[in-house]
Amino acid sequence: MIDIKVLRENPELMKENIVLRNLDPNKYDVDYILELDAKRRSLQKELDTLKAQRNKISQEIGKRKGEEREELIKKAKTLKEKIEELEKEYEKIEKELYLKLWQLPNFLSPKAPKGKDEKDNIEIKRWGNIKTFTFTPKDHLDLALLNDLVDFERGSKVTGSNFYYLKNEAVLLEFALFRLVIDTLLPEGFKLFITPDLARMEIIDGIGFQPRGPEAQIYRVEDTDLGLIATAEITLGGYHKDEILDELDLPLKYLGFSHCFRTEAGAYGRYNRGLYRVHQFSKAEIFIICRPEDSEEMHEYILSLEEKIFQKLEIPYRVVDICSGDLGAPAARKFDIEAWMPGRGDFGEVTSCSNCTDYQARRLNIRFRRVTGEVEYVHMLNGTAIAISRALIAILENYQQEDGSILIPKVLQPYIGISEIKPKK
């Protein structure tokens, strides 16, 4: 949520922010929000005055007798009724104000590139050499079916379209990838979590999980206030709701493992086939809570950890700085890692990392107390350590052989005990 004081002092900054994010200015009426804020403050001032008058009269009632006392009692009753009336109006305005504030996106980082959509994202780095095949490379789905690693047909029969079974060596790869992530991040001081797969909607809303477009919506559990989480960012972010942390304990570095559920309504096209865009997948999520002055450094740190994992896997990738018009509401700045995917002959997103500054902390009321005594909102950041479905695509396609077999990345071989997956069909 946005600090109303900042909005009050510089409304034009938010108006520009909305335009730069390629959002509809009519949906985010900053001037109306400020009108509500002014009404609320005016009502608060009036209420304070009336309550002071009521308190003064209440004190006088005990000192007076007869008609004078009765007159004061009437005045006190009139004031009470007026106060109750204004409190109802205040509550109504405050509720609308906070709803409007809740909908505003985070302020952009000055370093976030300006642009309209994903076409304006900026490539800032490449790593690794793209392999030249002496044959036409298959895509991951053909390879997975050839090697009996997935079953979409039975997944669809049991659960519905875009659900699947991971099988055989693909299961070993999932656990090996998680083990690689643990062995990479544990020495960095990360605490490990397996989080719930469900969260209250107030937590989901507090995190501000509002992906762009219709492609990633939350599954709601009917007749409850629960939703299936789309990322462990939600459950890790809610872990310290309504808490005041100690400055000396920051940064908090968490690594959370969870299933992720996304309806992915509207997702279609050849790039979305197979494992690229599915309703359920497993993921390890990096989550850091830090002081405001440290968040930019922590953002670069998360990116470096994500890079380290894909470098260990020896998969070529590029790093993309996401432009203003392609950012989700909570992120002030975001980096994506896109791995080379030979099956599509292009890069595809495998990780992201976002600096959400104090946006989520304000919504979830997570603060810290400095050693000097001041209490402030923390900054919160998140990043993908590994998303199994996307990582499998990159491994299968980059490590395929002409006969359809798959070499196991060297770094994963000790976890699995084999060096190659051989076709079974």
UniProtKB/Swiss-Prot annotation:
Keyword Transit peptide assigned: no
Top-level taxonomic group: Bacteria
Subcellular location: Cytoplasm
Binding sites annotated in the UniProt record for ATP: R262, T263, E264, V278, E349, V350, T351, S352
GO cellular component: a single term: cytoplasm
EC assignment: 6.1.1.11
Catalytic activities: tRNA(Ser) + L-serine + ATP = L-seryl-tRNA(Ser) + AMP + diphosphate + H(+); tRNA(Sec) + L-serine + ATP = L-seryl-tRNA(Sec) + AMP + diphosphate + H(+)
Entry's family note: Belongs to the class-II aminoacyl-tRNA synthetase family. Type-1 seryl-tRNA synthetase subfamily.
The protein's assembly and partners: Homodimer. The tRNA molecule binds across the dimer.
Function: Catalyzes the attachment of serine to tRNA(Ser). Is also able to aminoacylate tRNA(Sec) with serine, to form the misacylated tRNA L-seryl-tRNA(Sec), which will be further converted into selenocysteinyl-tRNA(Sec).
Name listed for the protein in its UniProt record: Serine--tRNA ligase
